[in-house]
UniProtKB/Swiss-Prot annotation:
Induction: During meiosis. The lineage of its organism: Eukaryota, Fungi, Dikarya, Ascomycota, Saccharomycotina. It comes from Saccharomyces cerevisiae (strain ATCC 204508 / S288c) (Baker's yeast). The keyword Nucleus applies. This is Non-disjunction protein 1. GO terms for cellular component: chromosome, telomeric region; meiotic spindle pole body; nucleus. Its main location: nucleus. Interacts with MPS3. One of its GO terms (biological process) is homologous chromosome pairing at meiosis. GO terms for molecular function: telomeric DNA binding. The gene is NDJ1.
Length: 352
């Protein structure tokens, strides 16, 4: 697991040295960031999510929305002026004061009227009845690479490697998709995802340590990155993410895996002020070439009752691979995987 720490090397400027200043800075930047995101019709999406108890889970609603109604791309050039790549670290530092919101961690943009659309970028399979107009949805696009991984593109080895992973995932589909050999698609994708997860977690860890040293100059924040990386990779696979094939895991067994991950999160819900816990599962039907995106959710009700904490597994999206472009399938796969990594990192980094 040893990696060159320069892989994630970035130039960070100190923002605040005290919790008070950090909170003030956070509130100011978050307000401006929220103005940027006001065009997102998430309230309209949430109002149609069933069952209603999930409508307050911002990250779940955001994942549904992006998988089903947003143009997913690998690069955005037109919204760099309001670009806060370190928002995720600020939220982690203030974990007891803020609710982490995925919409702050990805770069979104309005698509201008009349702008040429690349059909390969379209991800408008609407399995969620959101009630948002198709026209309005088509005017939104999002970069699947989180802000924290893409803000130093010209110098970032990690960013270049992410683009290589996009090509590798597509190459697998190009090679085995026409033959409908989805068993080999799974075998290759599974290996790619494993190394991809480690790459992104390592990148986040190096940047997190640099950020912590700048914002907490009087604290001891040095971490043994290989050890912490190993711990996060284990937690990611145990609690937050799974990718299973139909030939060794039935859909019922897949559901059980996600419910078991929910069970591991129950103590966290009781221990910390969180109303929801989220995990991510991919299931590939290797006979028919169908990729199912699914979330496991633990929800704590406000009312104190014997059924206060509930565990659910909910489908988020479905793709028949041969009916969609390789580009579209890979972008959705990678966005979903990125979301699982961010969920793991933001939940666990302060415990490492």
């Amino acid at each position: 697991m040893s990696k060159d720490n320069r892989l994630a090397s970035i130039l960070l400027q100190p923002v605040a040295s005290s919790s008070g200043n950090c909170t003030e800075f956070h509130d100011s930047k978050l307000h401006t960031l929220q103005e940027e995101l006001n065009f997102l019709p998430l309230e309209g999406v949430a109002s149609n999510v069933c069952p209603p108890m999930f409508r307050g889970h911002k990250n779940y609603v955001f994942v549904l929305y992006c998988l089903n109604q947003v143009d997913l791309v690998t690069n955005l050039q037109d919204s760099t002026k309001r670009y806060y790549p370190l928002q995720i670290f600020k939220d982690c530092q203030l974990s007891s004061l803020v609710q982490k919101d995925f919409s702050h961690y990805f770069q979104l943009s309005r698509q201008k009227e009349g702008e040429d659309r690349n059909d390969s970028d379209t991800t408008l399979v609407n399995v969620v009845n959101s009630g948002v107009s198709r026209h309005r949805s088509q005017l939104l696009k999002m970069c699947i690479i989180p802000r924290i991984c893409s803000f130093d593109k010209s110098n970032s080895k990690t960013y270049k490697l992410i683009q290589e992973y996009v090509n590798r995932f597509e190459t697998v589909l190009t090679k085995f998709g026409p033959e409908k050999d989805f068993t080999k698609v799974y075998a290759n994708w599974s290996k790619l995802i494993e190394s991809f997860n480690e790459l992104i977690l390592h990148d986040l860890l190096v940047k997190w340590q640099q950020w912590s040293e700048l914002t907490q100059p009087n604290a001891t924040v040095h971490q043994n990155i290989p050890n912490v990386l190993r711990e996060l990779v284990i937690k990611l696979t145990q609690r937050y993410f799974t990718f299973q094939p139909s030939y060794s895991c039935s859909i019922d067994e897949f559901t059980t895996i996600l419910l078991n991950k929910n069970a591991l999160s129950l103590l966290d819900v009781f221990r910390k002020p969180r109303k929801y816990k989220l995990n991510f599962g991919l299931w590939l039907d290797c006979q028919n070439g169908i990729l199912i995106f699914t979330n496991g959710i633990v929800q704590m009700a406000d009312e104190i009752t014997s059924e206060r904490v509930k565990s659910f597994v909910r489908p988020a999206h479905l793709l028949v691979l041969e009916d969609h472009s390789n580009d579209e399938a890979v972008k959705k796969l990678m966005f979903f995987t990125f979301s699982a990594i961010l969920q793991c990192f933001t939940d666990e980094i302060l415990n490492c």
